[in-house]
């Protein structure tokens, strides 16, 4: 759950990702102030954890949008390549007929 990291001043606790996730769920249900009091945390910790979680979700959404856009552009490029190949064959055919 938590482990203590020694520093010269005061030992710091590092909370596991599972603990952070559960703390954020609790904060959603009962509010940040009450959750912080119940879990013996600072409110700012919960706010920081929440903003980091939202940033991670936002970047995941961005990655999904980018991969969708990349797939669309690849399909479009393949269509253009096919059209170009057809036009080149037609140009070759008509060039031979004119001779």
Curated annotation (Swiss-Prot):
Keywords on record: DNA recombination, DNA-binding, Plasmid, Transposable element, Transposition
Secretion signal span: none
Pfam family, one: HTH_Tnp_1
One MF term in the entry's GO annotations: DNA binding
SUPFAM superfamilies with a match to the protein in the record: Homeodomain-like
Superkingdom field: Bacteria
Region annotated Disordered, chain positions: 1-21
Calcium recorded as keyword: no
InterPro entries in the cross-refs: Homeodomain-like_sf (IPR009057), RD_transcriptional_regulator (IPR051839), Transposase_8 (IPR002514)
Annotated GO biological process: DNA transposition
Described function: Involved in the transposition of the insertion sequence IS3.
Similarity annotation: Belongs to the transposase 8 family.
Protein name: Transposase InsE for insertion sequence IS3
Protein's organism: Escherichia coli O111:H-
Gene that specifies this protein: insE
């Amino acid at each position: 759950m938590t482990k203590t990291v020694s520093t010269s001043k005061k030992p710091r606790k590092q909370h596991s990702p599972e603990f952070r996730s559960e703390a954020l769920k609790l904060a959603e249900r009962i509010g940040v102030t009450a959750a912080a009091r119940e879990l013996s945390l600072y409110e700012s910790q919960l706010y920081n954890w929440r903003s980091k979680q939202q940033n991670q979700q936002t970047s995941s959404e961005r990655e999904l949008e980018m991969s969708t856009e990349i797939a669309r552009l690849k399909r479009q490029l393949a269509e253009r390549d096919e059209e170009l190949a057809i036009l080149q064959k037609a140009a070759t055919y008509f060039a031979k007929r004119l001779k």
